[in-house]
A protein has these predicted regions:
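Enriched for short, Lys/Arg-rich terminal
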Residues: 71-73, 77-100
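Basic/aromatic recognition patch in beta-strand/loop cores that engages polyanionic ligands
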Residues: 50-80
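A cross-family signal for key residues in well-ordered alpha-helices
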Residues: 17-20, 67, 88
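Basic, Lys/Arg-enriched alpha-helical interface segments
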Residues: 1-58
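Residue-level signal for beta-strand positions within conserved beta-sheet cores that form or flank
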Residues: 2, 61-62, 82-85
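Solvent-exposed, flexible loop/coil residues
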Residues: 5, 55, 62, 94, ...
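Short, low-complexity, polar/charged sequence segments that are solvent-exposed and flexible
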Residues: 25-28, 64, 85, 93-95
Length: 100
């Protein structure tokens, strides 16, 4: 599983844009840092794809969850041991079940 291709869904891009805009209202530098951290985390997933946690209490879908900085939840899926798809980047304040 070392040669996974990264795919980021349009919903995940939209999630990150919303998060960035929200943070940037108070601190543009912090917003940029947060975006860099998300992308660094995606790179970590490519090296360690099973680092996330399955949560059957959240969803029946075969996805993994990974918390970033306590307030953000990355939802991703490994497809055919070839692709790592970032599905969503949510805040922990959102109703995760309804967002999936």
């Amino acid at each position: 599983m070392n040669n996974l291709e990264l795919e980021i869904t349009s919903k995940a891009y939209n999630d990150m844009e919303i998060i960035s805009e929200f943070i940037a209202k108070d601190n543009k530098s912090a917003a940029s840092k947060m975006m860099r951290l998300f992308y660094k985390t995606f790179e970590t997933f490519l090296k360690h794809p099973n680092i996330g946690t399955s949560r059957p209490d959240f969803t029946y879908m075969d996805v993994k969850f990974y918390v970033v900085k306590k307030n953000y939840l990355i939802v991703y899926r490994i497809i055919d041991n070839k692709k790592l798809r970032i599905l969503r980047v949510l805040t922990t304040y959102q109703d995760v079940c309804s967002e999936l």
